């Protein structure tokens, strides 16, 4: 028995040593393996991806390969070639890693999972007439949730809250009622669902990276179990209509032979996908407005000028707010686009330089660093400038340049050309409606006049819209 154990240990060490001897071949990206065999840069990468990858970019340029926990990951930071590279679905697979994350985070397996067909199905329900219907339903649900009685407000009295909690809870509850078709708008029940979702959401990065401890795992598992129960058709107030987005998704799962247990787990996946980003984004928008008086005045003036417009018209005629939103997303949208390299592949950067990728490696694109935080594209990229996406005449600014050449993307909050988030228009409508409602129906101010927006939680890099490490304390009351 002892000899068997020693043999296994010896073989493991041999594999690590042999795999760790990888060297850079001709025309491959710069290779940075780190100091620790096998582990490489995994700890630094997971702790703060933006800080680590920024350091690697300064050292190696727009493309490099790093070792992390036995994997070799090529990071591409040339935004002008994102589309050309990611469009090669024959060499780059997005399904395998998605399956890994689904298992780790949601404890679910969907053998027939097809991201492309799922995206096309979602696009059918989040554009055109369906989008208008969803937006109207969202607006009605938000108004119900923001009545004085629902918000616990009394005449002329101030109420204190954390801005992140306020924005996230309101948009989560609104989205839950709108997208999942739940008719039960009981305040206590909705709050309970939101609180369990937040318990789960806080631990999601650790679940994804398998760095969760025993106590945290128990908390996440308990929250998952409760959410699964609430998200079954019997847990919702009615069975989703087949022509609705949720109904079509359930039917797709059934057609693929997914059993009932896995279907309810898939509901939590969709809850997080549809509701995990709008609330945090609304927080950052409101946070930047409240801490930048000039931006707040400009948005208030724009809202006041459009009060007579219908919802659809008001959503389309807000260049100042749109610039605020784009600037906010530039600073806080930090998804990591990941693909597995299934066959040796050659890629060409925008400067004409060609590099080879190896089969079995992983490719990552991180738009947060480039183009969003690239100082050659955006002056003082770490600063919030509400008019960054406005021309002098207050029209939308579309042209941004790097080294004299126009860049295709000044920001990539919703994904690249062939990988756009299908729910982006609905998310923008929800964020706008919440911010407009807060600014027109309530007096809202910072508890500390000198407060600034909190720092980001670095563990959230790679998972969509960033979340703050703390909250921003505010007080608000009904406007008369």
Swiss-Prot record:
InterPro entries: Cyt_P450, Cyt_P450_CYP7A1-type, Cyt_P450_E_grp-IV, Cyt_P450_sf. This is Prostacyclin synthase. It is a single-pass membrane protein. Its EC number is 5.3.99.4, 4.2.1.152. Catalyzes the isomerization of prostaglandin H2 to prostacyclin (= prostaglandin I2). Catalyzes the biosynthesis and metabolism of eicosanoids. Catalyzes the isomerization of prostaglandin H2 to prostacyclin (= prostaglandin I2), a potent mediator of vasodilation and inhibitor of platelet aggregation. Additionally, displays dehydratase activity, toward hydroperoxyeicosatetraenoates (HPETEs), especially toward (15S)-hydroperoxy-(5Z,8Z,11Z,13E)-eicosatetraenoate (15(S)-HPETE). GO terms for molecular function: heme binding; hydroperoxy icosatetraenoate dehydratase activity; iron ion binding; monooxygenase activity; oxidoreductase activity, acting on paired donors, with incorporation or reduction of molecular oxygen; prostaglandin-I synthase activity. The chain crosses the membrane at residues 1-21. The gene is ptgis. It is found in: Endoplasmic reticulum membrane. One of its GO terms (biological process) is prostaglandin biosynthetic process. Its cofactor is heme.
């Amino acid at each position: 028995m002892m000899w068997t154990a020693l043999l296994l240990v010896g073989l493991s060490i041999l594999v690590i040593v042999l795999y760790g001897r990888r060297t850079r071949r001709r025309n491959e990206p710069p290779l940075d393996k780190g100091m620790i065999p096998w582990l490489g840069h995994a700890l630094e990468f997971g702790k703060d991806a933006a800080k680590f990858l920024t350091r690697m970019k300064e050292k190696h340029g727009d493309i490099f390969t790093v070792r992390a926990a036995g994997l070799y990951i090529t990071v591409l930071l040339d935004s002008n070639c994102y589309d050309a590279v990611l469009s090669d679905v024959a060499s780059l697979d997005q399904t395998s890693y998605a399956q890994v994350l689904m298992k780790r985070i949601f404890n679910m397996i969907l053998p027939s999972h097809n991201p492309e067909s799922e995206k096309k199905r979602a696009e059918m329900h989040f554009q055109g007439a369906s989008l208008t219907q969803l937006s109207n339903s969202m607006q009605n649900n938000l108004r119900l949730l923001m009545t004085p009685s629902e918000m616990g407000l009394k005449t002329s009295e101030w109420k204190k809250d954390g801005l992140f909690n306020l924005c996230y809870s309101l948009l989560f509850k609104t989205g839950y009622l709108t997208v999942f078709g739940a008719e039960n708008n009981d305040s206590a029940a909705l709050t309970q669902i939101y609180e369990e979702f937040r318990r789960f959401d806080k631990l999601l990065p650790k679940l994804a990276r398998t760095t969760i401890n025993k106590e945290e795992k128990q908390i996440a598992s308990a929250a998952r179990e409760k959410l699964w129960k609430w998200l079954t058709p019997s847990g919702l107030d009615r069975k989703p209509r087949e022509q609705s987005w949720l109904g079509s998704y359930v039917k797709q799962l059934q057609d693929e032979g997914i059993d009932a247990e896995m279907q309810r787990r898939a509901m939590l996946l969709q809850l997080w996908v549809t509701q995990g980003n709008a609330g945090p984004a609304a927080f950052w928008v409101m946070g930047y407005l409240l801490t930048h008086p000039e931006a707040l005045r400009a948005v208030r003036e724009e809202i006041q000028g459009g009060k007579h417009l219908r919802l659809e018209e008001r959503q389309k005629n807000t260049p100042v707010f749109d610039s605020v939103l784009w600037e906010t997303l530039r600073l806080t949208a930090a998804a990591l686009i990941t693909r597995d390299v299934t066959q040796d592949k050659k890629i060409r950067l925008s400067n004409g330089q060609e590099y080879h990728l190896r089969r079995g490696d992983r490719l990552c694109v991180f738009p947060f660093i480039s183009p969003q935080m690239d100082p050659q594209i955006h002056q003082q990229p770490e600063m919030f400038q509400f008019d960054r996406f406005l021309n002098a005449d207050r029209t939308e600014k579309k042209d941004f340049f790097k080294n004299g050449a126009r860049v295709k993307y000044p920001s990539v909050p919703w994904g690249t050309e062939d990988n756009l988030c299908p729910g982006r228009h609905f998310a923008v409508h929800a964020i706008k409606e919440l911010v407009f409602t807060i600014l027109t129906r309530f007096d809202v101010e910072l508890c500390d006049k000198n407060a600034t927006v909190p720092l980001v939680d670095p563990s959230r890099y790679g998972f969509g819209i960033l979340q703050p490490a703390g909250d921003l304390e505010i007080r608000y009351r009904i406007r008369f």
